[in-house]
Curated annotation (Swiss-Prot):
Chief subcellular location: other
Official protein name in the record: Cathepsin K
Domain of life, per lineage: Eukaryota
Family membership noted in the UniProt record: Belongs to the peptidase C1 family.
Length: 329
């Protein structure tokens, strides 16, 4: 009995001091991500959200270690935000009410011949560094710019960062930081006669007046093609034959917010309710799990240095084929 009580003492002491331990972690997290708050009340409310997220991350990773999940989570710079806030402030897919498919824009895959079992356009030099859209609903602009960058590299052999801010400010049929759609951005570049480089038109993360400068034009566009909805085989063909592809996904879950590594598959990810645009830069298989390689626009602190592996051939996981498209150059 005395031995039992003795063994319990460290556990009791530990249970009474979680706040002190979390204080240290909280201060370290704030310093790492340069977090500052307007008031003590604001900091306390953010701290409580952070603690809740931290507990969910720990619980998930325990399950992952037991083989329940194919991916792990990690605390990141979004730790003091709820998943609802992330969707509201850091996504931005806004689908036009009049959106419809046309035979003129539908991508018809060439089914003859094999395509590689895996491909990674990062290794081929088609992909610029990961960016951070900040609290501006401009995911559509980053996805569009990324797809244009891939086609520019394919056509000219040169990799050059293009300007999401040019799209945010100048695509009048979209809503800037209020959201937008990728094919609308491709149409703008086509009708405008070009898009500026990132160096000429840097990102500021808020709506500004259109400052497009034709003399700084870095790429053109001849139109776009849309991948058949729900067809992952067609998307694979497009990635292999065309290059990086703009896609939309559901990014509303905490499991996506704190994704760290592994193949992301959450059965609660809603394929019928996409809200965020990303860029598919490849595909492959990891430990028997087929995946897409996606480039996000939440900075390198998110995911695996800004990237994620998303389940492939798992019933259109997260709606990845719902609104896939690419520009023609």
């Amino acid at each position: 009995m005395w031995v039992f009580k003795f063994l319990l003492l460290p556990m009791v002491s530990f249970a009474l001091s979680p706040e002190e331990m979390l204080d240290t972690q909280w201060e370290l997290w704030k310093k790492t991500h340069q977090k500052q708050y307007n008031s003590k009340v604001d900091e306390i409310s953010r701290r409580l959200i952070w603690e809740k997220n931290l507990k969910q991350i720990s619980a998930h990773n325990l399950e992952a270690s037991l083989g329940v999940h194919t991916y792990e989570l990690a605390m990141n710079h979004l730790g003091d935000m709820t998943s609802e806030e992330v969707v509201q402030k850091m996504t931005g897919l806004r689908i036009p009410p009049s959106r419809s498919y046309s035979n003129d824009t539908l991508y018809t895959p060439e089914w003859e011949g094999r395509v590689p079992d895996s491909i990674d356009y990062r290794k081929k030099g088609y992909v610029t560094p990961v960016k951070n859209q900040g609290q501006c609903g401009s995911c559509w602009a980053f996805s569009s710019a990324g797809a244009l960058e891939g086609q520019l590299k394919k056509k000219t052999g040169k990799l050059l960062a293009l300007s999401p801010q040019n799209l945010v400010d100048c695509v009048t049929e979209n809503y800037g930081c209020g959201g937008g759609y990728m094919t609308t951005a491709f149409q703008y570049v086509q009708q405008n006669g070009g898009i500026d480089s990132e160096d000429a038109y840097p990102y500021v993360g808020q709506d500004e007046s259109c400052m497009y400068n034709a003399t700084a034009k870095a790429a053109k566009c001849r139109g776009y093609r849309e991948i058949p909805v729900g067809n992952e085989k067609a998307l694979k063909r497009a990635v292999a034959r065309v290059g990086p592809i703009s896609v939309s996904i559901d990014a509303s879950l905490a499991s996506f917010q704190f994704y760290s590594r592994g193949v992301y598959y959450d059965e609660n990810c809603d394929r019928d309710n996409v809200n965020h645009a990303v860029l598919v830069v490849g595909y492959g298989t990891q430990k028997g799990s087929k995946h897409w390689i996606i480039k996000n626009s939440w900075g390198e602190s998110w995911g695996n240095k800004g990237y994620a592996l998303l389940a492939r051939n798992k019933n259109n996981a997260c709606g990845i084929t719902n609104m896939a498209s690419f520009p023609k150059m």
